From Swiss-Prot:
This is RNA binding protein fox-1 homolog 3. It comes from the Eukaryota. The lineage of its organism: Eukaryota, Metazoa, Chordata, Craniata, Vertebrata. Pfam families: Fox-1_C, RRM_1. The modification Asymmetric dimethylarginine is found at R223, R319. Its main location: nucleus. Induction: By retinoic acid. Expression is up-regulated in P19 cells during neural differentiation upon retinoic acid treatment (at the protein level).
């Protein structure tokens, strides 16, 4: 009875570049048959009889394996040879590239010819550069060789040598690293002041629309000026300016009292002002200006807007706008407290000390700029 053939098995696709005809055959079920003539190992295939099938000989795989091996080894050799051929021509190219060396701790009297003479014995030098500042040499420089092989040889020979009592160091120069630039000046007009002092003395403070003094033109003229000494030049310019016209938001007499009087503090009592029938003169020394019945009238101080009208003007205007008659029934202050009579401390508080502009500026700087070194 004939044995049925096993199902046909096709060889797998070629792998690793090995042709399909040299791939090992698929495994077959091994059966033991007697009376069959063994096939010589040199044959690469198994002979089948019509009645019986012969098992696959062990020598078949052995005969096919060397064939596959003999095909792969030359391919690996060819690939290695190709890689070597690609690497060897590139080595001379790399050696021909220029290379830069960093030389540090050189004597301060060294100049470019001295450094060129020191390194010139090792090969052709393309460039020599010693770094200087305003005081002279900084003690290091750069030497650029035409070939990297000469640069490596110079680095090996000269690194650590003693030159005029100084041990020089020669290393490969690294790529230049661009450090972050310093942040730009926050003031567009070039003022280099801290925020507190810049707020007090900066021209922008006097150029805002809420400031009642017409100093915009003066501020624009001084815009961009690099100041010294706390911006005193521009500050003195504002002080030397003629007295400004009356504040638009307050009455003329009230403006003179607020601006040309000492700084009114919260505890000061209101000074009654006499009614004025004639137009207000430009200066208090005019004969047409009626005398004030206020104890402060003898002390006339021209206050800047920062210390007088702008900061304390709101509260002072409120206090001075109260009725001048002492028989007022009741009045309230800015905190909502209602008083049935005049301020009980009206006659106990005398005139405050008059501070000059420089003293007030010093007080402001000392109080709010405690971290300023001077």
């Amino acid at each position: 009875m004939a044995q049925p053939y096993p199902p046909a098995q096709y060889p797998p696709p070629p792998q690793n570049g090995i042709p399909a005809e040299y791939a090992p055959p698929p495994p077959h079920p091994t059966q033991d048959y007697s009376g069959q003539t063994p096939v010589p190992p040199e044959h690469g295939m198994t002979l089948y009889t019509p009645a019986q099938t012969h098992p696959e000989q062990p020598g078949t795989e052995a005969s096919t394996q060397p064939i596959a091996g003999t095909q792969t080894v030359p391919q690996a050799d060819e690939a290695a040879q190709t890689d070597n051929q690609q690497l060897h021509p590139s080595d001379p190219t790399e050696k021909q590239q220029p290379k830069r060396l960093h030389v540090s701790n050189i004597p301060f009297r060294f100049r470019d010819p001295d450094l060129r003479q020191m390194f010139g014995q090792f090969g052709k030098i393309l460039d020599v550069e010693i770094i200087f500042n305003e005081r002279g040499s900084k003690g290091f420089g750069f030497v650029t060789f035409e070939t990297s092989s000469d640069a490596d040889r110079a680095r090996e020979k000269l690194n650590g040598t003693i030159v005029e009592g100084r041990k020089i160091e020669v290393n490969n120069a690294t790529a230049r690293v661009m450090t972050n630039k310093k942040p730009g000046n926050p003031y567009a007009n070039g003022w280099k002041l801290n925020p507190v002092v810049g707020t007090v003395y900066g021209p922008e403070f006097y150029a805002v629309t809420s400031f009642p003094y017409p100093t915009t033109g003066t501020a624009v003229a001084y815009r961009g000026a690099h100041l010294r000494g706390r911006g005193r030049a521009v500050y003195n310019t504002f002080r030397a300016a003629p007295p400004p016209p009356p504040i638009p938001t307050y009455g003329a007499a009230l403006e003179q009292t607020l601006v040309k009087m000492p700084v009114p503090w919260a505890g000061l009592a209101p000074c009654p002002l006499p009614p004025q029938q004639t137009p207000e003169p430009a200066y208090p020394t005019s004969p047409a200006f009626p005398p004030l019945s206020c104890p402060f009238a003898s002390r006339v101080v021209y206050q800047d807007g920062f210390y007088g009208a702008e900061i304390y003007g709101g509260y002072a205007a409120y206090r001075y706008a109260q009725p001048a008659a002492a028989t007022a029934a009741a009045y309230s202050d800015s905190y909502g407290r209602v008083y049935a009579a005049a301020d009980p401390y009206h006659h106990t508080i005398g005139p405050t000390a008059t501070y000059s502009i420089g003293t007030m500026a010093s007080l402001c700087r000392g109080g709010y700029s405690r971290f300023t070194p001077y």
